[in-house]
């Protein structure tokens, strides 16, 4: 689950980090009042969306008066912001953040952390190249990114943070501020179950203060039951409508841009199914994993979800029966086809637990379903069914 910038800053500030002060505004008049409340000569108005690249897309503007703040807010709120991280429709802007002017600054740094699946540890990344796309830095100048793995038994140690500060070229008060920032960020990461966080840029002001000018936090969705206050910050308007509906039925769904809908049980098999569709010249319209313990109701909802996409011109159902029984899947497919009024070809491959029984149920149903014998045969048939 992603947080908005203003929410991320509030959370980080509660852990002792110095952040760029700001006020969230849900309409132009609130934005104008926020400018006056901040009391500076300048302010920065930022669209609050769950996507990067806001500046290049026109979602970040410097304003010099309350009237300018009102005008910028009016141009953003109620519109969709399209960035390189969104789809063609973009993300809806329901609010803007009006933030204080912290410039001029002497330097812009980068600080972030993720759970590294290889080392199975929280890994911090820091760089002198703040304020730019860190992905570009990683690609063009990987040596400019410092990495620190944190031992989960003892946590992040002050000496590790000081070492990073030295390597970043910080000195005096800046070092102490950076250590406090990094230790506070780690505490927040662990206690709030972050999956990822980024501060870009982390600005070094002329007075030596280190301030978070931006903040990005992604929370581990599997741990949200432990954090009801954080869960209350969820903004469903920023989520893909189909993916949101899928999550309500415990389905793992990701929308893609192809025309062959996929329903599979198991993430690995789903990935393999998409690969072989591509191999045979097709393009998957989605990733959809109904899970190892799929129920009839979940399968029906999955089928509806696939066919809600008007780009879908054929469907491939690939089930390997282990915990889930193929005969139950077959009954759910029949029920879903009848309920949804399917008009596209449906290829079904069943293997494993009660596969023969499931195949017979489908064959006796009288529906125009295309049986497949093996994964390659299924991919070949679904691609050919497109004509």
Curated annotation (Swiss-Prot):
Substrate binds at residues 265, 322-324. SUPFAM superfamilies: Glutathione synthetase ATP-binding domain-like, Succinyl-CoA synthetase domains. It catalyses: succinate + ATP + CoA = succinyl-CoA + ADP + phosphate; GTP + succinate + CoA = succinyl-CoA + GDP + phosphate. The keyword Magnesium applies. Mg(2+) binds at residues 200, 214. Residues 9-245 form the ATP-grasp domain. Heterotetramer of two alpha and two beta subunits. Succinyl-CoA synthetase functions in the citric acid cycle (TCA), coupling the hydrolysis of succinyl-CoA to the synthesis of either ATP or GTP and thus represents the only step of substrate-level phosphorylation in the TCA. The beta subunit provides nucleotide specificity of the enzyme and binds the substrate succinate, while the binding sites for coenzyme A and phosphate are found in the alpha subunit. This is Succinate--CoA ligase [ADP-forming] subunit beta.
